[in-house]
């Protein structure tokens, strides 16, 4: 009797599971819930509430394990949790589900470079940059350059920064990277030209102004160094870059 009852209950349960898996309305409801829980999980992740983020993203995966958005968000979570094996798995799964999504390619590239896998990181940055669906290819080329710099491939990095600037001439971080490399390698005239040209026609940043001070100072151009130092102190008085001026011994006042 008990065996028969157990068999009946298992049969009913199996029928309900199959019904839930095949009912289009229930599937749509679960997928909508997964979208909602993914958004909540990402919001918690951005606020640093990792336990709540994991709870919501685990729930989202149960609701729709084949969503690339869910897998991508989980990859970012596992990266924050310092679980590289699980992060890798989730990144791979997201790219399996959406192999041409440039945002997933870029996110995975950032993760790879931050974990020291530079060559693979550059590969995925370039895939994102060359993807016609990617709205900010200059960012990906710039990121590839930063990744190459971390591996001390400065010549290849310069090409990436120049490509980024060819796409977006207003890209201040690429200008800084390019001029800083020239400064590092003693190409002061080239660094001077890049900085002056940009700062005379585009919006300044504290990092660019400090680099300009250093380049002018290295060239022995004390007057221009002081002028850029003054701009830095006036426009960004509380910045780390303004505080760094004291190490150069310049009197901008």
Where are these regions (language model features)?
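Bacterial Sec signal peptide processing site at the extreme N-terminus
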Residues: 15-37, 253
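Terminal, low-structured helical/coil segments at or just beyond the last alpha-helical repeat
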Residues: 202-253
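Canonical tetratricopeptide repeat
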Residues: 39, 73, 107, 141-143, ...
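Structural marker of alpha-solenoid helical repeat scaffolds
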Residues: 29, 63, 97, 131-133, ...
């Amino acid at each position: 009797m008990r065996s028969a009852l157990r068999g009946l209950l298992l049969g009913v349960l199996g029928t309900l599971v199959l019904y839930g898996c095949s009912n289009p309305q229930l599937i749509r409801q679960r997928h909508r819930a997964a979208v909602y829980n993914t958004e909540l999980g990402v919001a918690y992740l951005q606020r640093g509430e990792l336990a709540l983020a994991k709870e919501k993203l685990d729930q989202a995966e149960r609701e729709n394990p084949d969503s690339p958005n869910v897998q991508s968000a989980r990859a970012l979570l596992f990266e924050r949790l310092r679980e590289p094996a699980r992060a890798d798995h989730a990144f791979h799964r997201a790219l399996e589900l959406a192999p041409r999504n440039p945002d997933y390619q870029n996110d995975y590239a950032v993760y790879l470079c931050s974990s020291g896998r530079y060559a693979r990181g550059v590969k995925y940055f370039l895939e994102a940059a060359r993807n016609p669906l990617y709205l900010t290819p200059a960012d990906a080329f710039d990121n590839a350059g930063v990744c190459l710099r971390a591996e001390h491939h400065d010549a290849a990095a310069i090409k990436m920064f120049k490509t980024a600037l060819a796409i977006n001439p207003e890209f201040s971080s690429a200008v800084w990277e390019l001029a800083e490399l020239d400064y590092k390698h003693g190409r002061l005239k080239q660094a001077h030209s890049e900085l002056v040209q940009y700062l005379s026609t585009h919006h300044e940043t504290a990092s660019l102004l400090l680099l300009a001070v250093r380049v002018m100072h290295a060239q022995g151009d004390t007057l221009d160094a002081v002028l850029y130092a003054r701009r830095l102190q006036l426009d960004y008085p509380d910045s780390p870059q303004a505080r760094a001026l004291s190490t150069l011994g310049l009197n901008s006042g």
